[in-house]
């Protein structure tokens, strides 16, 4: 019972510290990011699996299923193992690792910065710059959007990215710490690359 309480406090503390670090620092460009690594792993694994399975609908389904299962499970196992080893060395090291990964699993500051850039350009009534700003956060052509279209695209993207980049990772952090949050990010990254 005492261990479970300590584990819960470690996870809660790491999630709160990670959230605050994300708000303060965002994603520094110099820091390697797990989602970038996940994207590289997905690219390599897709190529390998496509060579090993026949180029038929059934082969693609089998390869996709294997990748969809192995990426989050591998992420969970690796991150969980690192956290366990860190805990064996010292609880403070485990807390530091969990905090770092919680920070990297979140995207609140980036979302705030990008949406504020759209708002600034709209307030200046600079529609071409507002289109360019919203184009950095949406996956569609923004060249012909009206001001209302820019607002709609920004609101839709902020809502979706808040769920994907803030709310869901926090939920998974509270359920299973940084390893589970990063496993969620692995699933989300795979889905994002598939669409």
Residue ranges of predicted features:
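Hydrophobic alpha-helical transmembrane segments
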Residues: 4-182, 187
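Short hydrophobic transmembrane-like helices used for membrane targeting/insertion
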Residues: 1-2, 191
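Conserved small/polar residues in nucleotide/adenosyl-binding loops
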Residues: 22, 192-195
């Amino acid at each position: 019972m005492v261990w479970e309480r300590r584990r819960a406090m470690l996870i809660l503390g790491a999630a709160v510290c990670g959230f605050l670090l994300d708000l303060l620092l965002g994603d520094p460009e110099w820091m390697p990011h797990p989602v970038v690594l996940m994207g590289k792993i997905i690219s390599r694994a897709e190529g390998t699996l496509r060579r090993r399975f026949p180029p038929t609908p059934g082969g693609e389904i089998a390869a996709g299923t294997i990748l969809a299962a192995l990426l989050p499970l591998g992420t969970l196992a690796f991150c969980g193992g690192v956290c366990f080893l860190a805990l064996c060395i010292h609880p403070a090291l485990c807390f530091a690792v969990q905090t770092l990964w919680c920070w990297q699993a979140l995207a609140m500051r980036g979302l705030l910065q990008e949406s504020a850039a759209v708002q600034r350009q709209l307030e200046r009534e600079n529609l071409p710059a507002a289109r360019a700003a919203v184009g950095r956060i949406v996956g569609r052509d923004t060249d012909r959007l009206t001001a209302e279209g820019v607002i709609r695209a920004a609101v839709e993207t902020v809502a979706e990215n808040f769920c994907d980049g803030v709310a869901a990772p926090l939920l998974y952090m509270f359920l299973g710490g940084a390893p589970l949050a990063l496993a969620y990010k692995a699933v989300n990254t795979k889905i994002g690359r598939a669409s």
